[in-house]
Amino acid sequence: MDIEDRQVLQEPAQIGRTRIFSLFEIISAQKLLVVILIFATLLRVGSALYQGNAVIDLPGIYDQISYDELARRVISGFGFSFATGHWPATRAGEPTAHWSYLYTLYLAVVYVLFGSKPIVARIIQAVIAGVLHPWLSWRIGKRVFGPVTGLVSASLSALYIYFFYYAGGLITETYYIIGILWSIDVAFRLVSQAKKSGRTGISGSYRWRLWIELGIAIGVTVLLRQVILLFLPFLFLWLWWNMSKDTSIPNQSYSLLKRFRWSALRGFFVTVFVILLLIAPVTIHNLRAFHTFVLVNTNSGFAFFWGNHPIYGTHFVGLLPTGAQDYYNLIPKELLPLNEAELDRALLNKGLQFVFDDPMRFVLLSLSRTEEFFKFWPSPQSSLISNISRVGSFGVLLPFMLYGLWISVKLIWKPKNSEHRSEIILLYLFICIYTTIHLISWALIRYRLPVDAVLLIFAAYGLIDLGKRIQFLRKYLPSY
């Protein structure tokens, strides 16, 4: 726990003076946070127990069947392969890089240690998520909008139906969201410590540790889902722009080097080196398996090809009627003899050709994905669990997310809030860039969940603001 955390936890009286929730007046911030983490963990463990020891097709988490089979194949000595033909177009016994190596190994390790019992992997994941996810939401919310918002943000993350439902599923979403929040938290700490270093004499070694931690956070996140790579240039650009001057640079040369923010550039090299170190084993494995370069996974080409296929016209459909077979039939037959890596690359080229052939259709198709990506209403095609999760989480909190975004814009333009302006902008960047990535490729509700994790911070800020306004209005309401 860093210095700022201890300062916040030692100021429960300040939280009580907000007079928004009387509970804050009798329970310290530290105790309240612990209660939130315990409750979040219980909800997620409950979800894990509900999903049980059987690995079956449940709404939104069908991929757990693939991960479970892959893990069992790995510990049986067959490597990353399937016994029969498998999604997306992997032949029996042939290597696959379509699925997260890291998550597969997580399941394999659990199965080796505790036997092939999926429920154990579910419970371990639920406990980790129950602690880390709300805790990171608290840290980010507290840093950007204050300690009360941090606590409300942690509470919303704990109660969000999607999050505790997916925490019990054997898929990458839960750890992936934690990895994204961890990366954002480290980025915030880096900029904060860089700004303080000149004033407080914070050691440079601490800052280097943060650059290394950022590399680990991003590396783990990439190994869970490589799509986050597309956000990294924007994250690094934000870091580069917001790093303050490096006091180690001599005064006579500072004016030139300041423009390049030399301290940030050096840090980037360290972070990128750590990332490459983490993903290198995967890249080397892929080279040996497919005899061609694959950085992490073989799924971007499949997703972009299927997501932009002319079969949709200008209106995207989340899932085609007969599922996997429909998608398989869309692959040109002359490409099917290729191995998975070669096929992924060929399909990416085909998908790009769809865009070049009809750019306007691509634009309209991308816009049509907003309906699927931001769906908050019940659907007759969805199961009861899906509809309850959708309406009871995103549907209920969407107005507060939008309100929080709206009022946070005003903070950016207030000079007295300049300290947190850059942090709010990074959250905006993530929401916009990550959403755009999926609108131009493949949009499903579960792909939106990392965005939800950030939007909940704005929802918390909006709720706090509304609480203050309601309290203010009470003074002018007649009493009976």
Regions found by a protein language model. Give the residues of each.
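Transmembrane-helix motifs of polytopic, lipid-linked glycan transferases
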Residues: 123-145, 182, 186, 399-403
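Membrane-interface transmembrane helices that cradle and orient dolichyl/undecaprenyl
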Residues: 183-213, 240-251, 463-466
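Membrane-proximal stem/loop segments at transmembrane-domain junctions that anchor or position
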Residues: 293-368
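Loop-to-helix entry region of an early transmembrane alpha helix in multi-pass inner-membrane enzymes
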Residues: 97, 101-108, 114-132, 154, ...
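Membrane-interface anchor segments at the N-terminal boundary of transmembrane helices
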Residues: 120-123, 127, 346-347, 353-431
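Transmembrane-helix signature of polytopic, membrane-embedded enzymes
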Residues: 119, 131-159, 177-178, 204, ...
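Multi-pass, polyprenyl lipid-linked donor-dependent membrane glycosyltransferases
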Residues: 121-128, 152-190, 208, 220-234, ...
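Start-transfer (signal-anchor) and selected internal transmembrane alpha helices
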Residues: 1-49, 244, 256-274, 423, ...
